[in-house]
From Swiss-Prot:
One of its GO terms (cellular component) is cytosol. NADP(+) binds at residues 202-225. Its EC number is 1.7.1.7. It catalyses: IMP + NH4(+) + NADP(+) = GMP + NADPH + 2 H(+). InterPro entries: Aldolase_TIM, GMP_reductase, GuaC_type_2, IMP_DH/GMP_Rdtase_CS, IMP_DH_GMPRt. NCBIfam families: GMP_reduct_2 (TIGR01306), PRK05458.1 (NF003966). It comes from the Bacteria. This is GMP reductase. Keywords: NADP, Oxidoreductase.
């Protein structure tokens, strides 16, 4: 098995077949909807809030609302009232089951539900998927997070419509340091490994440090890429604004950090400060243009043409050119 990550992989270009990069289509289908980009902001309190999710939905982007200090039922009602699709997060505890029961009682169905726990290959996730499929079968269920082919196979067999791959590769995640487990440092390899057995979409979650990493994720099997740090630190971001030596920053912390939990218990996340980057819309436009460029380098016109390219591994035992596999 090849072990590599984003920083030691480069994709190999093929003959360009478009007159302009603007001809390239970056859109992707997930469930019954098509979205402008294969990118979704991380469902974290310092990355998304109700206002940002509404704007994303209204402008053709996918989103997943976080599950912390939120009335999910009211959120879904509010999104539907504005003509937007609803995409929420659930855990696997009793209050999450109570939320599902409220959806049923009020005749409400969120279009997307992400079962979002740190170690998603678990009986507790199996039970929640089963419950969701029985109670609100129309919802598209994303389950995670996982990092092995066995986990992807199980989640799909349990009824998940998509899986979220990535255990601890994120910028504010310290799972590998605290536990000795995870995909940090080899997230791209883990994605490739999992994609080989997947029959349903994969959302690659974590480890993205540049826009080129999005193309690499698509090449190795991702339908959608969840991004935290690149979306944190915008003017609209919900994180607290902090001034340091005359420079403005936004707080960005992991969902399993003590800052998010409000207590120091089972902590696997940390807090950092992200320099304020400007407006979210400008970053999304730049992302779209960069992914269009990636598609043009792949010799194609559509996003999934990126999957047809070869790649090289830089350094290490697996260094050299790797033909399409």
């Amino acid at each position: 098995m090849e072990i590599f990550d984003y920083d030691n992989i480069l994709l190999l270009p093929r003959k360009c077949r478009v007159e302009s990069r603007s001809e390239c289509d970056t859109s992707v289908e997930l469930g019954e909807r098509r979205f402008r980009l294969p990118v979704v902001p991380a469902n974290m309190k310092t990355v998304v809030d109700e206002k940002i999710c509404t704007w994303l939905a209204q402008n053709g982007y996918f989103y997943v609302m976080h599950r912390f200090d939120l009335d999910n039922v009211q959120f879904v009602k509010d999104m539907h009232a504005q003509g937007c699709f609803a995409s929420i997060s659930l855990g696997v505890k009793q209050p999450d089951y109570d939320t599902v029961d409220r959806f049923v009682a009020e005749g409400i169905c969120p279009e997307y539900i992400t079962i979002d726990i740190a170690h998603g290959h678990a009986d507790s996730v199996k039970n929640m998927i089963t419950y969701l499929k029985a109670k609100i079968p129309a919802a598209f269920v994303i389950a995670g997070n996982v990092g092995t082919p066995e986990a992807v196979i199980d989640l799909e067999n349990w009824g998940a419509d998509a899986t979220k791959v990535g255990i601890g590769p994120g910028k504010v995640c310290i799972t590998k340091l605290k536990t000795g487990f995870g995909t940090g440092g080899w997230q791209l390899s883990a994605l490739k490994w999992c994609a080989r057995v997947a029959t349903k979409p994969i959302i690659a979650d974590g480890g993205i440090r540049s826009h080129g990493d999005i193309a690499k994720s698509v090449r190795f099997g991702a339908t959608m890429v969840m991004v935290g740090s690149l979306f944190a630190g915008h003017e609209e971001s919900p994180g607290k604004t902090v001034e340091v030596d005359g420079e403005l920053y936004k707080e960005y912390y992991g969902s399993a950090s003590d800052f998010n939990k409000g207590e120091y218990k089972h902590v696997e996340g940390k807090r950092i400060l992200e320099p304020i980057k400007g407006k979210l819309a400008d970053t999304l436009t730049e992302m779209e243009q960069d992914i269009q460029s990636s598609i043009s380098y792949s010799g194609g016109k559509k996003l999934m043409d990126i999957r047809k390219v070869n790649y090289v591994i830089l350094g290490g035992d697996n260094a050299g050119e790797h033909l399409l596999m």
